[in-house]
Regions:
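RNA-contacting regions in translation and RNA-metabolism proteins
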Residues: 1-43, 51-76
Length: 76
């Protein structure tokens, strides 16, 4: 799932080499921390948060098919 988020995020930004994803395993949920270049933050979040919302929905759907729970956090 980390690779999927990395691929999606890199396709959205102008500085794909600056994109990193860190997995943080909680007790019952996997948190994926997404870090991007500060210049690309707006592109990842989108107007009124629409893009990151859709990315989160997609990641939850993939996780649900695997019987897992996941959350995506954008870290600056």
């Amino acid at each position: 799932m980390k690779d999927l988020l990395l691929c999606i995020a890199r396709s959205l930004v102008e500085h794909p080499d600056d994109v990193t994803v860190t997995e943080v395993q909680g007790t019952d949920e996997l948190t994926l921390e997404l870090r991007v270049n500060p210049d690309d933050m707006g592109k990842v979040i989108g107007r009124q948060g629409r893009i990151i919302k859709e990315v989160r929905i997609l990641m939850r759907a993939v996780a649900q098919r695997k019987g897992r729970r996941v959350s995506v956090e954008v870290v600056d």
